[in-house]
């Protein structure tokens, strides 16, 4: 959510500078990442609304199974990244506990998409 700015209009900043090919990835993968992030932060109704509008505008056929795959993947990656903090000696035990809670929440979310 740190790359979504709310002002007069919603602006989504996604600037991949290190690999030009990555800039042109599957749009559905990017939408799935944002949907997962919204749901993680309690914005399920916003996620549902965005998905409805995307689906109506993109007119892609039967992409829900692929959407769920991308959402599982992104949630697992976020959970994994948070899990890495547990072994970081520079992070306080309180911050490690928070990282564990975030990781659990991401892994639980991933499981919900896989059902």
Model features per residue range: what roles?
Residues 17, 24-58, 73-90:
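Active-site activation/catalytic loop segments of kinase-like enzymes and analogous catalytic loops
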